[in-house]
Amino acid sequence: MSYSQQVNKRRTFAIISHPDAGKTTITEKVLLYGNAIQKAGSVKGKGSQAHAKSDWMEMEKQRGISITTSVMQFPYHDCLVNLLDTPGHEDFSEDTYRTLTAVDSCLMVIDSAKGVEERTIKLMEVTRLRDTPILTFMNKLDRDIRDPMELLDEVESVLKIRCAPITWPIGCGKLFKGVYHLYKDETYLYQSGQGHTIQDVRIIKGLNNVDLDRAVGEDLARQLRDELELVKGASNEFDHDLFIRGELTPVFFGTALGNFGVDHFLDGLTQWAPAPQARQADCRLVESAEEKLTGFVFKIQANMDPKHRDRVAFMRIVSGKYEKGMKLKQVRLGKEVVLSDALTFMAGDRSHAEEAYAGDIIGLHNHGTIQIGDTFTQGEDLKFTGIPNFAPELFRRIRLKDPLKQKQLLKGLVQLSEEGAVQVFRPLTNNDLIVGAVGVLQFDVVVSRLKSEYNVEAVYETVNVAAARWVECSEAKKLEEFKRKNEQNLALDGGDSLTYIAPTMVNLNLTQERYPDIQFFKTREH
C-alpha cells in the first residue's frame, strides 16, 4: 500500500460529552465493533466484573470516571481508526482541551433525556477554534427521552451548528423499536438485552413496507411516517462540505448500553470524516501528504505501566512515516534522538510500533526530557502551534507528612506538571510548594498519585492565592525592577517560567495597571 493510501485510510477522532452521557459505554462498543475487545466490560467496574478497557488508572477504576486520555487504534471496514478517549469529568478541561488539538473530527454524545449540557457547550467551543467536523450521537433511546425534534432544535440554537438527521428513532424507553435510516430507506429493529456482543439486526427495506407495521405495531409505524414528513420538511439535508467546515453535524440515534446504532455513526465516520489534515507550524503549513516525519506531543502520562516507573509522551504524527530506529530532531532542545521503541496503544495494553503514519498517535518513552508541545522532525526547524497551557483557577499549598521526603515530592510534582495533570509554583522568597489546578478533582488525583507512584504522603493547606499569570517583558531592565519590587508575589512554574501569584483579583488588576510594560498572560503556548 502506498504512503498516500495509508494516510487516507486513517481517521483520528475524540468523543466529547457531558459526564454521564454514556461516553465510556460508547467507547467500549466502538472497540467491540473494531474487534478490539471480544466482550464489552461493565463500565463502572462493580466488584468482580470486567473494568471498562479505556479506564485503566487506579483512581478511575474506583470512581468510574475516565481521568486521562487513552488512545485506542482499531480497524473498521477499510479504515484504521484512532480513538482518543477524553476525560469525561468536568474537572479535566486542560487534558481534554489539548487532546482536541490532536484529532481531525469529534463525536458528540448527548443524553437524549437531558439534551445539551454545560460541559458539552464548553467542549464545542474548543472544537470551534479549529472548525473540527462533528458527528452527533443521541444516546439512551432505551430510556424515556425528550422529543427528538426538540433535541435537534436545542443543538442548533445552543451550539450554533446545523443538524442533519441520518437516522430517526421509532419510539423510546420500553417502546423503543429501532431506527429508520433516512438515506438508505431501511429500518433497523432493536432487541433489548443484547448489549455485550454484536448482534445480527433485522433490517426492513422501505418505509411503506407492511413488514414494518407488523414489526413495530401500526401506531408506531404511522407515527414514524408522520414524523419523517415533518423531518424532511423542517431539517437540513446532509451536506459534506458544510460538515467538513464544522457548520453541520450528521445526527444518529441509538443506545450505547443496548449496543444499538453505534455502527451507524462508525459508518458515517469512516465515510465522511476527514483523513489526517494539514497543520499550522510557526513558519509554514505542514501537509499530511509530505513524506518527511513531523509530529507534536500533546500529552504526557506517567506510569502507564505500574511495574515500571515510566512516562510516555503521546505524539500525533502530522506528516510522514515512523519506522523503528529512525533518527528525529527534538526541535526545542536542538538534539537528535533515536526512536527505537515507540508504542502503539490499545488502552493500557502497549505494543511496540514497527511503523506508523500521519494521523496515528505513538508513545515515546520519556525520561524527563520531553515536554507537552514539543515538536519532532527529520531535521527541519519548525514548531507546531496551538497547544495551550491555561492559568489555573484553584490553588493549594502542599505539605509533606514526612519532611525528609522533600526531594521525592518535588520530583513527583514536576513530573505531574509536565504531564499536564497539575501546575506547580515555587515562590521565590520561601520553600513553599503551591499547586494550581483547573478543577478540584485534580487535587485529589495528585495526592493519590504521589502516594501510589512516588511513595509520598502529602496534605493540602489553604493558601492566599487568587490567580496566577505568566509574566514577560521585552526590556530586561524593566523586568528586573518589576522582580525586585514584587518578589513576594513571584514564583517559578514547573518549567521555570516566571509567574505572578496574586493574593486577590484586585491586587492583580492594580499590579497590571502599575506596570504597563509588563505583559501578564492567562494562557501560554507549551
Curated annotation (Swiss-Prot):
DNA damage as a keyword of this entry, yes or no, is: no
| Molecular functions (GO terms) | GTP binding; GTPase activity; guanosine tetraphosphate binding; translation release factor activity, codon nonspecific; translation release factor activity, codon specific
Recorded hits in CDD domains, A to Z, give: RF3, RF3_II, RF3_III
Q: Which InterPro entries match?
A: EF-G-like_DII, EFG_III/V, G_TR_CS, P-loop_NTPase, PrfC, RF3_C, RF3_dom_3_sf, RF3_GTP-bd
Give the tr-type G domain ranges: 8-277
Q: Which domain of life is it from?
A: Bacteria
What is this protein's function per UniProt? Increases the formation of ribosomal termination complexes and stimulates activities of RF-1 and RF-2. It binds guanine nucleotides and has strong preference for UGA stop codons. It may interact directly with the ribosome. The stimulation of RF-1 and RF-2 is significantly reduced by GTP and GDP, but not by GMP.
Question: Where does the UniProt entry say this protein principally localizes?
Answer: cytoplasm
State the similarity comment: Belongs to the TRAFAC class translation factor GTPase superfamily. Classic translation factor GTPase family. PrfC subfamily.
Gene symbol of the encoding locus: prfC
Q: What's the protein name?
A: Peptide chain release factor 3
Where does it reside?
A: Cytoplasm
Q: Which organism is it from?
A: Histophilus somni (strain 129Pt) (Haemophilus somnus)
Name the PROSITE patterns on file.
G_TR_1 (PS00301), G_TR_2 (PS51722)
Alphabetical UniProt keywords: Cytoplasm, GTP-binding, Nucleotide-binding, Protein biosynthesis
Q: Where does GTP bind?
A: 17-24, 85-89, 139-142
Please provide one cellular component term from the Gene Ontology annotations of this protein: cytosol
Name a biological process GO annotation: regulation of translational termination
